[in-house]
Amino acid sequence: KMTQSEPMKPTACLALADGTIFYGHGFGATGETSAELCFNTAMTGYQEIMTDPSYAGQVVTFTFPHIGNTGITPEDDETVDPVSAGMIVKWDPTESSNWRATEELGPWLASRGRIGMGGVDTRRLTRAIRQQGAPHVALAHDPDGDFDIAALVQKARDFSGLVGLDLAKDVTCAQSYQWNEMRWAWPEGYAPQTAPKGGSRERRRLS
């Protein structure tokens, strides 16, 4: 099995059930988790993906390298808390640049017990996913870089998988609630708009 060369000080490790190991830089929560591994090719919407109920029990590999650069905006959550088990990215998240953001990706993951891992060859990892289906993995984040590789591989092999699980029960809200949020609006209001001369009614509806 091929093993990615270790960076100077790896603080995160991803172990596949077949023994393949990926090293990287951890962010978010510390600790270990086992899950199913999948990938997503979207260029935007990482927050929506992490909170999408359909990703429950899965570690998501993002093939687009710029993840985290728009921070976290509470209004963009698909559910109250992220349901994905963790995330794998090419480059470590940088400081966000988004006037709507209220939090950075790393602290947001940490406060919700989710592990992130950067510095990974996500193309190679995605090829492994395509070849193996949805491999079982163990993901670990330790600031000291102290990993028991054999134990992580065994943890990945011991993961029972998602087949047959009632995941809807885990991601559904505990009780009904009222939806009180309105359509988002610019807090300072909008300047008057002048419709172009000769513009169609359809164009005015869209403007």
Question: Regions from the language model: what does each represent?
Answer:
Residues 3-207:
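RNA-binding accessory domains that recognize and position tRNA/RNA substrates
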